[in-house]
Amino acid sequence: MIDGDGFRPNVGIVICNRNGQVLWARRYGQHSWQFPQGGVDDGETPEQAMFRELYEEIGLKQDDVTILATSRNWLKYRLPKRLIRWESKPVCIGQKQKWFLLRLDAAKEACIQFGCHGQPEFDDWRWVSYWYPVRQVVSFKREVYRRVMKEFAAIAMPYLPPVAKKEPRRKGYR
């Protein structure tokens, strides 16, 4: 399912633990790492798609996690031209994503497994510091990651002080 602008509806999943770390997964047979994500099927809500993808990609079930937040908006990224499948119709130029912040029940960490549904998407995972993915994700996804992590920060890490607002500059002062 691709919308009229060429974007495929998709869900992104940020899974955090009680230490404010996030689950970072390595794509199967590759050196690139990312958050779990996947398409929204026809007739499926974003939340239904998120739980389906959570199980298919990570092996976790609805009872293993708690939804802490959902992104306010759909966030879009464009694929690099070299990754666009021009022969497919309709042409998909990128993804629009609804993001979910989940907290994993500490006792359920052992339930993480790959390949619960066909070919696995990932072959390894680890806990990383909250902002690490923004610096490490493939460049064309970086702005979406930055925006979603900024939106979820206060919920994922409530012990952090709020971001200070920039003081307005007064004329004549540097």
Curated annotation (Swiss-Prot):
Domain Nudix hydrolase: 6-150
GO cellular component: cytoplasm
Swiss-Prot/TrEMBL keywords: Hydrolase, Metal-binding
Pfam families assigned: NUDIX (PF00293)
Entry-linked PROSITE patterns: NUDIX, NUDIX_BOX
InterPro entries, alphabetized: Nudix_hydrolase, NUDIX_hydrolase-like_dom_sf, NUDIX_hydrolase_CS, NUDIX_hydrolase_dom, RppH
Renumbered ranges of motif Nudix box: 38-59
The UniProt record lists the keyword RNA-binding: no
E.C. numbers: 3.6.1.-
Listed GO MF terms: metal ion binding; mRNA 5'-diphosphatase activity
Cofactor: a divalent metal cation
Keyword Manganese: no
GO biological process, one term: mRNA catabolic process
Domain of life (superkingdom): Bacteria
NCBIfam families from the UniProt entry: PRK00714.1-1, PRK00714.1-4, PRK00714.1-5
Family, as annotated: Belongs to the Nudix hydrolase family. RppH subfamily.
Entry function: Accelerates the degradation of transcripts by removing pyrophosphate from the 5'-end of triphosphorylated RNA, leading to a more labile monophosphorylated state that can stimulate subsequent ribonuclease cleavage.
Identification of the protein by name: RNA pyrophosphohydrolase
Species, as recorded: Tolumonas auensis (strain DSM 9187 / NBRC 110442 / TA 4)
